Swiss-Prot record:
Belongs to the EARLY FLOWERING 4 family. One of its GO terms (biological process) is positive regulation of circadian rhythm. Homodimer. GO terms for molecular function: protein homodimerization activity. The gene is EFL4. InterPro entries: EARLY_FLOWERING_4 (IPR040462), EARLY_FLOWERING_4_dom (IPR009741). This is Protein ELF4-LIKE 4. The lineage of its organism: Eukaryota, Viridiplantae, Streptophyta, Embryophyta, Tracheophyta. The keyword Mitochondrion does not apply. Component of the central CCA1/LHY-TOC1 feedback loop in the circadian clock that promotes clock accuracy and is required for sustained rhythms in the absence of daily light/dark cycles. It comes from the Eukaryota.
Length: 114
């Protein structure tokens, strides 16, 4: 029985590791998009300063790409927020449900009001 209780901790550690990897990948994706946006903004500014009709026309496409990237970043942050909230909910459910310690005694958490 004690092995069953302790094996749950290993599963939790693996789950936390996967969650952390997922968060890290999302943050890397966001940073890549933000870096791309910085390049787009620089090009848009250069085109604007040149005042050449072809460059100004190209800005239309660049601005659309910039807007799409902003939507992608907002979506990624929304997904991150949702995943984080879900993981916190799952974590708090596990902690408040009364688990067994490795010595077999119940582990009930008390919450103070206030």
């Amino acid at each position: 029985m004690e092995g069953d209780v302790l094996s749950g901790f290993g599963d939790r550690h693996n789950m936390d590791g996967k969650l952390l990897q997922s968060f890290q990948k999302s943050f890397v994706d966001v940073q890549d998009i933000l870096d791309q946006n910085r390049l787009l903004i620089n090009e848009i500014n250069q085109n604007h300063e040149s005042k050449q009709p072809d460059n100004l026309g190209r800005n239309v496409g660049l601005i659309k790409e910039l807007n799409n990237n902003i939507r992608r970043v907002a979506s990624l942050y929304g997904d991150l927020s949702h995943s984080f909230a879900r993981s916190v909910d799952a974590s708090s459910e596990g902690e408040s449900s009364g688990t067994l310690k490795s010595d077999g005694k119940a582990n009930q958490k008390r919450f103070r009001s206030g």
